């Protein structure tokens, strides 16, 4: 039986998940419980667990949204260990794209299943090795984006509409609402992609996103993407009219026909592909703000054990 070490974001999902946390606290194999208290606190907590835990049955149980999951993953991977600590995940946030991609189900279903799992599944996570704006290595489970999608993340996180939609349990609607208002303020920018022996330079880019699974903000940006396949993809969208954008946006919620549009480019990235965003743009990693910068980084994949 696993021993669970819990990292819980009490603010996820507007904090309306007391019944879920009470059920988990009553589980006999919950060993320690940590509440996050400030941004990036989950990184610190996970790093500490990776440094100190010698429990062979330890599983880090994340209760929160995609952001808390991302912080935990990055904290655990900052420490070299003989064996990685598996991550279990109960989605209670407003951004639950990872849970959607893994078909995890509701929090109640996850709680019931946690005790029945006998070994973790190895899942691919994206890895970026940055040269600019910071020399750093970071990991993501969903996507890493620059331009429009990152601007939407930043605007949504600081918008009063996010709280309103979350209270109505329409978290994805906050992204959709912000997307339309952000469209008119997003400038185009040049991007260079060095992908194996192939080289691409696009001049009027509107959005550049590296994806590890189908969803962004609940929308299927790349329906065929699969967390269990050893592959990262990149979607690049060029600047377009608002009507054109609206047509594409509707397609995102259906069958992926947006990928056939002449303004949309899909690249299957080889390991070691290099991306260069030449102008200063906002960035996001699993829905968490990276700040603004001109980005230069290399992409690759790594597997990590998940208790799902």
Feature locations, PLM:
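Short glycine-/acidic-enriched loop or helix-start segments at secondary-structure transitions
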Residues: 16-17, 71-73, 99-101, 151, ...
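Short, well-ordered alpha-helical microsegments
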Residues: 42, 69-70, 217, 292
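ATP/NTP phosphate-donor binding region
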Residues: 1-63, 70, 74, 79, ...
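ATP/nucleoside-binding phosphotransfer catalytic cores, i.e., glycine-rich phosphate-binding loops
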Residues: 195-197, 202, 221-222, 226-229, ...
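Glycine-rich beta-alpha junction loops
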Residues: 10, 144-148, 211-214, 239
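Catalytic core of DAGKc-family lipid kinases
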Residues: 79-88, 92-200, 204
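Glycine-rich phosphate/pyrophosphate-binding beta-alpha loops
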Residues: 149, 207-222, 289
């Amino acid at each position: 039986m696993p021993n669970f070490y819990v990292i819980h974001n009490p603010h996820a999902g507007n904090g309306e998940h007391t019944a879920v946390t009470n059920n988990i606290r009553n589980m006999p194999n919950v060993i320690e419980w940590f509440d996050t208290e400030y941004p990036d606190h989950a990184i610190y907590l996970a790093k500490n667990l990776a440094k100190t835990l010698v429990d062979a049955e330890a599983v880090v149980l994340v209760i929160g949204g995609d952001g808390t999951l991302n912080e935990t993953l990055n904290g655990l991977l900052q420490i070299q260990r003989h064996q990685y600590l598996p991550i279990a995940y109960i989605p209670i946030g407003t951004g639950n794209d990872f849970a959607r991609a893994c078909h995890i189900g509701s929090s109640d279903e996850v709680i019931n299943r946690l005790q029945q799992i006998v070994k973790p599944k190895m899942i691919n996570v994206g890895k970026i090795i940055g040269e600019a704006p910071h020399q750093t290595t970071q990991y993501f489970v969903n996507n890493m984006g620059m331009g429009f999608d990152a601007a939407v993340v930043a605007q949504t996180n600081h918008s009063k509409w996010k709280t309103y939609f979350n209270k109505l349990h329409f978290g994805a609607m906050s992204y959709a609402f912000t997307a339309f208002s952000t469209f008119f303020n997003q400038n185009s920018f040049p991007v260079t992609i060095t992908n194996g022996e192939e080289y691409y330079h696009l001049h009027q880019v509107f959005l550049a996103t590296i994806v590890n699974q189908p969803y962004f903000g609940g929308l299927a940006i790349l329906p065929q993407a699969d967390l269990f396949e050893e592959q990262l993809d990149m979607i690049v969208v060029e600047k377009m009219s608002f009507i054109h954008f609206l047509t594409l946006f509707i397609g995102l919620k259906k069958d992926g026909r947006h990928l056939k549009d002449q303004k949309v480019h899909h690249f299957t990235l080889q390991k070691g592909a290099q991306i260069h965003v030449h102008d200063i743009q906002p960035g996001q990693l699993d829905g968490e703000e990276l700040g603004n910068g001109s980005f230069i980084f290399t992409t690759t994949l790594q597997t990590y054990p998940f208790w799902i």
